[in-house]
Amino acid sequence: MTAAHPVAQLTAEAYPKVKRNPNFKVLDSEDLAYFRSILSNDEILNSQAPEELASFNQDWMKKYRGQSNLILLPNSTDKVSKIMKYCNDKKLAVVPQGGNTDLVGASVPVFDEIVLSLRNMNKVRDFDPVSGTFKCDAGVVMRDAHQFLHDHDHIFPLDLPSRNNCQVGGVVSTNAGGLNFLRYGSLHGNVLGLEVVLPNGEIISNINALRKDNTGYDLKQLFIGAEGTIGVVTGVSIVAAAKPKALNAVFFGIENFDTVQKLFVKAKSELSEILSAFEFMDRGSIECTIEYLKDLPFPLENQHNFYVLIETSGSNKRHDDEKLTAFLKDTTDSKLISEGMMAKDKADFDRLWTWRKSVPTACNSYGGMYKYDMSLQLKDLYSVSAAVTERLNAAGLIGDAPKPVVKSCGYGHVGDGNIHLNIAVREFTKQIEDLLEPFVYEYIASKKGSISAEHGIGFHKKGKLHYTRSDIEIRFMKDIKNHYDPNGILNPYKYI
């Protein structure tokens, strides 16, 4: 990897208390021979040279790195089934992997687990324009799903900054929330059916198109957000929304978070049915993004403590523009905003969204970042970011080099009470980690929040569920894992 993409420390070395499960078999030539008997050369990547497998072993945040020497890239559900049956019989540990854009270390190995990549399962299976039902392989890239549906006057009900890389099966397996949760809700409500390969190779094929089905337990819900710990999602059936005929956005500069909350209340009241996103960013987030984007002109003339991006989508452009123009005038007259800009065309719309979507990549561009994803009541939403920034400043860790922390950045989805806290760093150090944890989790627990709003648990938050979940809930989760995966071979050392 180049200097722009530094190599993370091996997870096994960074976390020496985590030990490889001695019950798991070490891959040998007999295993390779079996996989070569069922897969083509294009479906196997095997090398002793770490750099050749680096993109499969290292996570996007450059924080976790495994030691897998075998990447399997099957192109069918049947092949996934054969792989899982063999691995279960032989007790070979497996990590399912989509686009590897995960943010909690869930999609890369910890030790020498086999990586099962879904990238070759990338076909659209079916689309019904009447019901809006979209069926596809798990490895379809979200960007391609969006483009396919756009060409058929529909949209995928989820959008993420990582849409160019993340895969549909991956976002389902992690229950990603995204930028339009406020309008379209969660994947638990949008996914109609799944095709899943269990650890023993059995296939649950319920990739149906029914909006209603009240016959027994809704098993698909167990696999949405399970992070590949109890089954490998290979196919998805999901409800696509009709493509809006009118899209618009406004970008505001605001001086305090109390005003952000007041603006949200006003937006819900006055924009109501056309409101599709309400995002906020703090000063640190935008400062990082300005430095990262460099040549892209910033939409506002002045710097502010907070910024808000509001998106509207509807079926009548004239109606929507009138509502948004009136809203902009009213917020200006009432002094709720310090400065604002309304998109004039599609190019403006895309540019405004670039300032929000680029924040994670900008924060990660200095060398790495510590990332937290939390749910809180709206009145408490920004308080965790302020508390962490104060803590890092008091320790003298934030500033120009050689200080390790570049900035502490808070941003997120006001509409669903979700804040992302990114600590942009030049290097990962134990001093920073000790200042952040368990402080962040204890703070969230004290506010009755959730330590993971949408990014999941993975390796990063394993063992920390008690900050959000009760003992009985955790026990039930372990029972589910033990039932579906008694040998523990699927995505071990993570989740529960």
Curated annotation (Swiss-Prot):
Catalyzes the reversible oxidation of (R)-2-hydroxyglutarate to 2-oxoglutarate coupled to reduction of pyruvate to (R)-lactate. Can also use oxaloacetate as electron acceptor instead of pyruvate producing (R)-malate. GO terms for biological process: filamentous growth; lactate biosynthetic process. There is a cross-link at K17 (Glycyl lysine isopeptide (Lys-Gly) (interchain with G-Cter in ubiquitin)). Keywords: Cytoplasm, FAD, Flavoprotein, Isopeptide bond, Oxidoreductase, Ubl conjugation. Gene3D superfamilies: 3.30.465.10, 3.30.70.2190, 3.30.70.2740, Uridine Diphospho-n-acetylenolpyruvylglucosamine Reductase, domain 2, Vanillyl-alcohol Oxidase, Chain A, domain 4. Its main location: cytoplasm. The gene is DLD3. This is D-2-hydroxyglutarate--pyruvate transhydrogenase DLD3. InterPro entries: FAD-bd_oxidored_4_C (IPR004113), FAD-bd_PCMH (IPR016166), FAD-bd_PCMH-like_sf (IPR036318), FAD-bd_PCMH_sub1 (IPR016167), FAD-bd_PCMH_sub2 (IPR016169), FAD-linked_Oxase-like_C (IPR016164), FAD-oxidored/transferase_4 (IPR051264), Oxid_FAD_bind_N (IPR006094).
